[in-house]
C-alpha cells in the first residue's frame, strides 16, 4: 500500500499539472471506485463537471483536490469541497495517456485536454466528494478529520505524540500504524524507523522512554523525507507517480524485505516475523526482542 512518501509524490505531480484546470468531462468506469461517495456515480460526475481544481493537499495516506465546486451553480469562488482520493493497495493517479483499459476506474478530461485517470487493479481505492471542515486549525475533508497529523506536517507535535504513545500498553509498532495516533506511517516505514532507532516493534510503547520514542518518530520523519526525494518505494508496477514512473527508494531500505541479509549496521542476519497479518523485519542484535 502506498504510504506517506508515495502519496506525497503523487500530490506534488498533481499540484504541478492540474491546479487551475477545470473538469470538462468525467466518467466513472467502475462503480466500486466511487463506493465511498454515498450519493452514487451520477451525483459525483454531475458535481465534478465544471469544477475548477484550486489546490492539492494531503494528510497521511489521503490526498485531495480542493475544488471551486460551488462556482458553477452558486457563483462562489471559495474552495468549499474536496475530491478525496484514497489509493488503497494499487491506486494510481495518472496524467496524459490512458493506461490499460481494464484498470481505469475513473477518468476526467481537463480544459487543456489533459486526461486525469484513476487506475486501480485491486479496486480498494477510490474517489469521493466531501465537505471541508476545520479541525485543529486546519481545513480538511470530513472523511479525513479523524486522522492525526503526520510526521512531515509542519504542525506535527512530537511531544504530544510521545505522550500519547507512553499511555499505550501495546506494541509500539501497532501504535505507529494507528492512523489516529500518527498518520502516514505504514508497514515499510515503521520497520525502517524502528531499525534506525534500534527499537524492536514488539516493545510495549508505555515501557519506552521519551528519548526512545522521540528517536523513533524522528527516524520516521527522516526516512520518509529520504524516500520522498527518491520518488517513494516501488516493489512492483502498482505504485507509480502521475507520469507512470516508479520510485527507487526500495534500493535504500535497511530493514524491510531484507530477511536473511546482513544488517548494514552490525552484520547480524536480519529476521522476519509475522505481525498483524503483515511481516516485520528487524535486526536481532540491534533490536533485541523483548522478554515475555
Curated annotation (Swiss-Prot):
A GO MF annotation of the entry reads: 8-oxo-7,8-dihydroguanine DNA N-glycosylase activity
Alphabetical keyword list: DNA damage, DNA repair, DNA-binding, Glycosidase, Hydrolase, Lyase, Metal-binding, Multifunctional enzyme, Zinc, Zinc-finger
Q: Which Pfam families match?
A: Fapy_DNA_glyco (PF01149), H2TH (PF06831), zf-FPG_IleRS (PF06827)
Cofactor(s) required for function per UniProt: Zn(2+)
Enzyme Commission number(s) of this protein: 3.2.2.23, 4.2.99.18
Question: Where does each FPG-type zinc finger lie?
Answer: 254-288
Please give the PROSITE patterns that the UniProt record associates with this protein. Answer: FPG_CAT, ZF_FPG_1, ZF_FPG_2
Question: Superkingdom of the source?
Answer: Bacteria
Kindly state which reaction or reactions the protein catalyses: Hydrolysis of DNA containing ring-opened 7-methylguanine residues, releasing 2,6-diamino-4-hydroxy-5-(N-methyl)formamidopyrimidine; 2'-deoxyribonucleotide-(2'-deoxyribose 5'-phosphate)-2'-deoxyribonucleotide-DNA = a 3'-end 2'-deoxyribonucleotide-(2,3-dehydro-2,3-deoxyribose 5'-phosphate)-DNA + a 5'-end 5'-phospho-2'-deoxyribonucleoside-DNA + H(+)
- Here the disulfide bonds are none
Q: Which SMART domains match?
A: Fapy_DNA_glyco, H2TH
The entry's DNA-binding residues are: 103, 122, 168
Q: How does it assemble?
A: Monomer.
- NCBIfam families, per the entry: fpg, PRK01103.1
Which purpose does this protein serve, as stated in its record?
A: Involved in base excision repair of DNA damaged by oxidation or by mutagenic agents. Acts as a DNA glycosylase that recognizes and removes damaged bases. Has a preference for oxidized purines, such as 7,8-dihydro-8-oxoguanine (8-oxoG). Has AP (apurinic/apyrimidinic) lyase activity and introduces nicks in the DNA strand. Cleaves the DNA backbone by beta-delta elimination to generate a single-strand break at the site of the removed base with both 3'- and 5'-phosphates.
Q: Can you say what this protein is called? A: Formamidopyrimidine-DNA glycosylase
**What is the source species?**
Mycobacterium ulcerans (strain Agy99)
Amino acid at each position: 500500500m502506498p504510504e506517506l512518501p508515495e502519496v506525497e509524490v503523487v500530490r506534488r505531480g498533481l499540484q504541478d499539472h492540474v491546479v487551475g484546470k477545470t473538469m470538462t468531462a468525467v466518467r466513472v468506469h467502475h462503480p466500486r471506485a466511487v463506493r465511498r461517495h454515498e450519493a452514487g456515480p451520477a451525483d459525483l460526475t454531475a458535481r465534478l463537471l465544471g469544477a475548477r481544481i484550486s489546490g492539492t493537499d494531503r494528510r497521511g495516506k489521503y490526498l485531495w483536490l480542493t475544488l471551486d465546486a460551488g462556482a458553477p451553480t452558486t457563483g462562489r469562488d471559495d474552495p468549499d469541497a474536496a475530491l478525496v482520493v484514497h489509493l488503497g493497495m494499487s491506486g494510481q493517479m495518472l496524467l496524459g495517456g490512458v493506461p490499460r483499459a481494464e484498470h481505469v476506474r475513473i477518468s476526467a478530461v481537463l480544459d487543456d485536454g489533459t486526461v486525469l485517470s484513476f487506475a486501480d487493479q485491486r479496486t480498494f481505492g477510490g474517489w469521493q466528494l466531501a465537505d471541508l471542515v476545520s479541525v485543529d486549525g486546519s481545513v480538511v475533508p470530513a472523511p479525513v478529520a479523524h486522522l492525526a497529523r503526520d510526521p512531515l506536517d509542519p504542525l506535527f507535535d512530537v511531544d504530544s505524540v510521545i505522550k500519547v504513545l507512553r499511555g499505550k500498553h501495546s506494541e509500539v509498532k501497532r501504535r505507529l500504524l494507528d492512523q489516529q495516533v500518527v498518520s502516514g506511517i505504514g508497514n515499510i516505514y515503521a520497520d525502517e524507523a524502528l531499525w534506525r532507532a534500534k527499537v524492536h516493534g514488539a516493545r510495549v510503547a508505555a515501557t519506552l522512554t521519551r528519548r526512545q520514542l522521540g528517536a523513533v518518530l524522528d527516524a520516521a520523519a527522516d526516512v520518509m523525507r529520504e524516500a520522498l526525494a527518491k520518488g517513494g518505494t516501488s516493489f512492483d508496477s502498482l505504485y507509480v507517480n502521475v507520469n507512470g514512473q516508479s520510485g527507487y527508494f526500495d534500493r535504500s531500505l535497511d530493514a524491510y524485505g531484507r530477511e536473511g541479509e546482513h544488517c548494514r549496521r552490525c552484520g547480524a542476519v536480519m529476521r522476519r516475523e509475522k505481525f498483524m497479518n503483515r511481516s516485520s523485519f528487524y535486526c536481532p542484535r540491534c533490536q533485541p526482542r523483548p522478554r515475555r
